[in-house]
């Protein structure tokens, strides 16, 4: 019997143990109670007393085991949790207790609930939404702004009452005032709406220095029965700046704004004789006019009017004084006569400047004659040395030309005298500096400024130029050494600088050693190799000398 058959018999007689099968048999299929059994005599039902009543405790919960873990069922959507239905812990004892104080405890609980509800309501009131807060802040700002405008209107009324001799009573059309009040009530909280009264308050500050006739022509206020003509519509539109105007106003304005295409008076049938389309456009585009349209028959005295400057005076006469040219008051008026003289003078001088007129933008402000200030011709030439002014140190155009011509002459003379210093910029700078020091017309600061302005001013060389110049010198010296005679002594040895002297001394010392090496190696085949070695060693020595000179020079 072989060993193989013995092993087969032994394996057949050995009992097989299925580990997984045994474990499967050990898993309990019946439910197993985790808590102690209620039927056992040791774990009988427990009794306890609570206000004289006895209750039995329920049996413990039995959990069924399973192979797979399963999640509990999901609650239905919209189902409230049990925490909302539970009563507070303080109220449970009151419900269970039965006695004479039960009514008092219930009353106290009701009072506590009312107080808690009030506290919650007060907290909810404190939490105001953000948009309501912004609306409140906006209303506060608007009220403050309206209070400021009211104060400004009171100040303007006081000023108008003090200047009643110049100003005249104003009027406002009923249709426009009702439209203005309606818009003010509708868009009070709108920031984009610009109120007409705000423009009135702003423009009254601009025109406090002279209260004059705001309309370019004299016309009577419109009555309730008569309709507004084109001129009244234009004058009213100059004061209104609302985003959504009346449709009738916009219709008439669109008809009248096309005056430059048909420039005749048929488009303005009800306008006065002296009215021009340019004045209507200036009324529309100029927002510096007061909103309350003041109407006057004539200006009593032009000398009483005060202007801020000459330009404002010319603007006033060009716009508003055209109507009163035929009055007797203006014939003996000095202000009017001076204005006419200034107009004649400026039109004579500037007749060629105003030949081309823009028809698309025919505003009267563009064609106003501007008085030019007379400047003395000798102001630039006369320079007082006592006055400490920066303009006194700057050279004029004539002196600058003289300095440039003088520098040009000096450059030509220096080229003839010294040929070697022809391209030397430092020599030219020093020569210009010496001659500028001797001049009596300019001081040191003036000489530096003139040198900076001249064509021949000194500019220091850049680093790249210095490096290129140095590389050229090194290449030239090495080339002269390699292709010169053995002695290497030229006739111009007296004019050499330190750099060339060092190179020549190095060349003389190495040339003698090279001659000996050439004599020894004439008959050998390795003469070229020794010559190359000697040249490489010489180049290394030359580089060391150049580095030494760089340190000494720079």
From Swiss-Prot:
Induction: Its expression is glucose-repressible. Residues 1-327 are annotated as: Probably encodes all the information necessary to anchor HAP4 to HAP2/3. Residues 124-300 are annotated as: Activation domain 1. Residues 359-476 are annotated as: Activation domain 2. The keyword Transcription applies. It holds the Pfam family Hap4_Hap_bind. Residues 1-127, 393-422 are annotated as: Disordered. Its main location: nucleus. GO terms for molecular function: DNA binding; RNA polymerase II-specific DNA-binding transcription factor binding; transcription coactivator activity. GO terms for cellular component: CCAAT-binding factor complex; respiratory chain complex. It is found in: Nucleus. One of its GO terms (biological process) is regulation of cellular respiration. Residues 36-47, 84-100, 410-421 have a biased composition (Polar residues). Keywords: Activator, DNA-binding, Nucleus, Transcription, Transcription regulation. The keyword Nucleotide-binding does not apply. Residues 101-118 have a biased composition (Low complexity). InterPro entries: Hap4_TF_heteromerisation. Component of the CCAT-binding factor (CBF or HAP complex II), which consists of one copy each of HAP2, HAP3, HAP4 and HAP5. The assembly of the HAP2-HAP3-HAP5 heteromer (HAP complex I) occurs in a one-step pathway and its binding to DNA is a prerequisite for the association of HAP4. Acts a component of the CCAT-binding factor, which is a transcriptional activator and binds to the upstream activation site (UAS2) of the CYC1 gene and other genes involved in mitochondrial electron transport and activates their expression. Recognizes the sequence 5'-CCAAT-3'. HAP4 encodes a regulatory subunit of the DNA-bound complex and seems to provide the principal transcriptional activation domains. Does not bind DNA directly, but augments the binding of HAP2 and HAP3. This is Transcriptional activator HAP4.
